[in-house]
Amino acid sequence: MDTIKIKFTGMGGNFDEKDNFITKILQERYVIRVEEDPDFLFYSVNSSDYLNYDCVRIFYTAENIVPDFNICDYAIGFHYLNFADRYIRYPLYLVDGFRAYAGDDYALNLQLALQKHVIEDDFLNRKTEFCSFVYSNAEAAECRRAMFDALSNYKRVNSAGRYLNNVGRPLENKLEFQKKHKFVIAFENTSTPGYTTEKIVHAFAAGAIPIYWGNPDIMREFNPESFINCHDFGLTEKGEQEIIAKIVEEVKRLDQDDKAYMEMLRTPAFTAENNVDMQRELFKKFLFHIFDQNIESAYRRNRFYWGERYERKQRIGNRFYWQCRKVIPIRDGIRKLFRRYK
């Protein structure tokens, strides 16, 4: 097998650059050496030091960020893009066992979601709670809080994340917690075509009906008869109350009609086009294509003149940004101090 020199940077969390979903695939075909002077760099959004590596760059994101192809040669992301051999869409929920961005096993959740429609007749008896809400990020679209408040006026919504926690204890196991509930509020932080994270899959895995908002094209991936799609009602980030009220009425209808509820549960989650095994094979093919080339042939970005000028501007901008980030905590500390002695 050929030997390849790689490195990862800016991936965030507890990412292990020697053992992750990318290295597991590459090890099927190559001998991997993780080195400081790589021939191929995988980078993400949590650092700007990728600009220090003059090698083939492969951008990966688990966030709602569009790749900058002036900086990277290849990219792995959420958006529905076509760019020759330089891009593949591989959303977060397909990343098996990738723990850098979540505390649970994606592989288990994905397999449960694929089989969520295979349930016994007494399945509904196991649902002891109405609806769950598990979030730690308060900086999200207004509609998420609006949905929580509106549904809470109908029945109690159990919030087990750091945001709006009303269960009085930290969450130990998200999957086991959500399994008790008939519904799950599965709202993304923002709404962008293609941006589908793990939230809807975790709801399916728990055997619950997702109340979903985020990717307006979600029906390209998941069966529209298997969940409540808030985009069908016209909900935007602002959380319009009259639209929220209509969604709540739909939740009430399903909550009060066991037959309709079970019919939705027994509908397969994934569309025929969203074949998980096929997407995995396409992802492998994408990676192997990059590394099967000799290094000079693998470059795609413009590395000369305008490409150099563009990258130089990025270096200056990134340096300023990261310096500002160092100052912000000091600024906030001074503000708190002045407020204390007012």
Q: Residue ranges of each PLM-predicted region?
A:
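Pol beta-like nucleotidyltransferase catalytic core
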Residues: 2-61, 65-163, 168-171, 175-184, ...
